[in-house]
Amino acid sequence: MIDLPLNYARVLYDMNIDPENLSTARSLLTESPELVEALVNPLVRRSEKRNIIEKLFPESLWNFLKVMSDNGDVGCASEMFDAYDGIVREKENT
């Protein structure tokens, strides 16, 4: 079985995004269920989702979040950030 949040977390870690930008994205995606719902809702047009991403998130995360949105995976953002934290801890201990 594929661990989707972990896979996204690994990609995010490899992107080496500025911690402040990650914090912004984490806050938006974990504290706004309405935002997550809009980004996973199949009734919201893809172009609208992309506009939302470009208006709210740091540019360094646009493509990553667009892929998550296109795949309907934004709903796993909280688990992804938890997995990301685990990767960071693991790398710091090696």
Predicted segment positions?
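Elongated, mostly alpha-helical coiled-coil "stalk/stator" tethers of large membrane protein machines
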Residues: 1-94
